[in-house]
């Protein structure tokens, strides 16, 4: 039973006891205190970003991973000069690299702003409109489902049970005649 330390008005140092079983206001005080010491709280707005691996969830592995060999290929028997091939490779690679950088410099921040607004609106609508509508619908449909269930058990179950008993006695004999 130990806890945090505090100093009273006379300057005496005291420890605040933390009970093993907790109390009605803070159950499991000791366990909670130990967890808080071990865990670091991370905020989504202040987390560090990885400048080396910019696609940690591999969203674009199959989509935009386009290299020179994926676009331009010369089959056997149809080859250009080696110098032309090397220059084409360099031109393609450098152009793609710098044009992407130019486009991301010009449109990256505005597009991030637009997508941030879009996903904020989408999250807002999902939290404050879609989920409450679905919950409301599920609550309202319960009375209909009960009436429907009574109807099925009263009329449909006996009917299909009788039909099943009728057809359960049908026997088919297959004979092969020579």
From Swiss-Prot:
Cross-link Glycyl lysine isopeptide (Lys-Gly) (interchain with G-Cter in ubiquitin), sequence positions: 5, 26, 30, 39, 47, 57
Asked whether the keyword Ribosomal protein is assigned, the reply is no
Give residue numbers for the modification (Phosphotyrosine).
Answer: 6, 14, 25
Return the GO cellular component terms, semicolon-separated: caveola; cytoplasmic vesicle; endoplasmic reticulum; endosome; Golgi apparatus; Golgi membrane; membrane raft; perinuclear region of cytoplasm
Q: Which residues carry this modification: Phosphoserine?
A: 2, 9
Cell compartment(s), UniProt: Golgi apparatus membrane; Cell membrane; Membrane, Caveola; Membrane raft
- Carrying N6-acetyllysine, the residues are 5
Q: Where is the lipid attached (S-palmitoyl cysteine)?
A: 133, 143, 156
Q: Where is this region: Required for homooligomerization?
A: 2-94
| Modified-residue entries (N-acetylserine), positions | 2
* Keyword DNA-binding annotated: no
Topology, Cytoplasmic side? 2-104, 126-178
PANTHER family in the record, alphabetically? CAVEOLIN, CAVEOLIN-1
What is the purpose of this protein? May act as a scaffolding protein within caveolar membranes. Forms a stable heterooligomeric complex with CAV2 that targets to lipid rafts and drives caveolae formation. Mediates the recruitment of CAVIN proteins (CAVIN1/2/3/4) to the caveolae. Interacts directly with G-protein alpha subunits and can functionally regulate their activity. Involved in the costimulatory signal essential for T-cell receptor (TCR)-mediated T-cell activation. Its binding to DPP4 induces T-cell proliferation and NF-kappa-B activation in a T-cell receptor/CD3-dependent manner.
Question: What is the recorded name of this protein?
Answer: Caveolin-1
Q: Lineage in the entry?
A: Eukaryota, Metazoa, Chordata, Craniata, Vertebrata
The record's gene field reads CAV1
